[in-house]
Swiss-Prot record:
One term under GO cellular component: plasma membrane
Naturally occurring in which organism (per UniProt): Bacillus subtilis (strain 168)
Membrane association type: Multi-pass membrane protein
Protein name: Uncharacterized membrane protein YkoX
Keywords: Cell membrane, Membrane, Transmembrane, Transmembrane helix
Amino acid sequence: MIHKHETRELVAIEELVMSWIEAFKSLSYFGIFLALSIEFIPAEVVLPLAGYWVSKGDMTLAGVVLAGSLGGVAGPLTLYWIGRYGGRPFLERFGKYLFIKPEALDKSDNFFKKHGGFVAFSGRFLPGIRTLISIPCGIAKMNVWVFSLYTFIAMLPITFVYVYLGVKLGENWKAVGSILDQYMLPIGIAILALFLLYLLMKKRKKRTHSEQLSVFLKNKR
């Protein structure tokens, strides 16, 4: 249950965020980029509002989508670098108290080197995870260019949909977040399920190949 004082605090926070976003508007597309670069400013608010500005002719759809997508990479990159230069040393020193062994860190590194791009991509579609996923990518020292590319590829359609709906709903742009939230999680889960299926099939194919090679070598003797 949300008490009245908590409601007032939430309203105050929302008003503060909105005032910042309105201030960013004066910077045009660079303002959109900056707003998306700051992780605690929700993209679910910025992008539909920017779509509303597009509907009024203040900006263009293409410009907002590009600026928003680039900003959507800059923000995660900050967390990536925090994970890269602060996360691994911390876990190597204190991981034993969290029951995290060095071998587990090495396995994580290998996994992200092989599949980090897909993890960075699919994580953008999962509410609650999309912000945090950048940190383990950094801890595993995933290639920064690969991380940035996959994050950008994911942000392009996400940004477009939020902005486009903001354009269509106009003054009712605030409804965009609640409309899309119900779809983002199923999409993210579906993408992860396909990825796990791919890994399973790849592992099975590798095992079958090993068995065939073993039989071939055995018959050669």
